[in-house]
Design a protein with these regions (language model features):
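Conserved beta-strand hairpin/beta-sheet module of binuclear metal-dependent hydrolase folds
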Residues: 35-85, 173-183
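Acidic/histidine-rich helix-loop elements
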Residues: 44-58, 132-134, 191-200
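Active-site metal-binding motif and surrounding structural segment of the metallo-beta-lactamase
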Residues: 66-70, 79-123
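Divalent metal-coordination and catalytic microenvironments
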Residues: 40, 63, 73, 88, ...
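Accessory terminal helices/loops
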Residues: 15-27, 204, 208-272
Length: 272
């Protein structure tokens, strides 16, 4: 079974044809770049030093239709977001029509304050709005419960809350015209060997959420993780494997701790 799964991942990787190194890349600054993934879409990649993790890249999405653009996730900070917006305005003559974050973390909406100062409309899951308000963060303007459909001209943007995973409020964005799925941080790149930071997530619900994503977006060709290289549907399968790995690890830790609690005092003393 494991060999079949590995083969499936390899096949999907080849079929997706997503080799990040072969894509047009625009380096805006040392901490910000754009990667063209379709005629109408770019991934913006920003870098920040995160305590305990080092210098980390984070992915966001830009959908373009004629002279308008929609932003999904900001770079890490207001200052990086300002650089991105100014570049889009200055080099592509684009108007930012709206913004929606994947969830409440700074790698998704760290630049929301700047966008609000610019008068740019913002949308988010109601769960994200509630958390942002509680944590005294900038609060997106308009919320939705289960789903939201927006339009950028004739291009349709579909947003869904399908359950907790990396965070309790994470959503997925689907762009049918481009066959682009942006599940953000709930999905891991193939280079990821673990789930990373899940302190604000739900490991129990994680697999079910990813399975709902797989079932709902069977025609997705481009899948954008929150961090690391872009891929295809194989990223969803890879993430489920990482969740299972984490759950086994958690189970072993729980079992070990439980054994210590029931261990005779004399034996416990000998162990330490």
């Amino acid at each position: 079974m494991k060999k079949i799964l590995i083969l499936l991942i390899l096949v999907l990787t080849c079929l997706s044809g997503i080799c990040q190194t072969n894509r047009e890349t625009i380096k805006i600054s040392k901490d910000l770049e754009l990667i063209k993934i379709s005629e109408n879409a770019f991934v913006h990649v920003s870098y920040s030093v995160v305590p305990g993790y080092g210098r980390i890249s984070a992915n966001g999405l830009i959908l373009i239709n004629k002279s308008n653009a929609f932003l999904f996730d900001t770079p890490w900070t207001d200052s990086l977001t300002m650089v991105l917006v100014n570049y889009l305005r200055g080099h592509f003559n684009l108007k930012i029509a709206g913004f929606i974050p994947n969830h409440w973390h700074s790698d998704c909406m760290g630049g929301l304050g700047y966008l609000q100062n610019q008068g740019i409309k913002s949308y988010a899951s109601q769960k994200t709005i509630d958390i942002a308000r509680k944590k005294k963060l900038p609060v997106p303007s308009k919320g939705f419960r289960d789903s939201l459909q927006l339009n950028l001209g004739e291009k349709v943007i579909k947003c869904y809350y399908l359950g907790a995973a990396h965070s309790l409020d994470n959503i997925v964005v689907w762009i049918p015209s481009e066959k682009i799925l942006f599940p953000g941080c709930m999905v891991k790149s193939l280079n990821s060997s673990d789930l990373g930071n899940i302190a604000d997530g739900d490991i129990i619900s994680y697999t079910g959420t990813i399975e709902r994503v797989i079932k709902k977006f069977k025609t997705a060709e481009i899948v954008i993780p929150g961090h690391g290289q872009i891929g295809g549907p194989e990223l969803l399968i890879h993430t489920i494997e990482l969740v299972r790995k984490q759950m086994i690890k958690n189970s072993l830790i729980t079992t070990f701790h439980g054994s210590l609690l029931t261990c005779p005092v004399g034996l416990f003393s000998a162990l330490i």
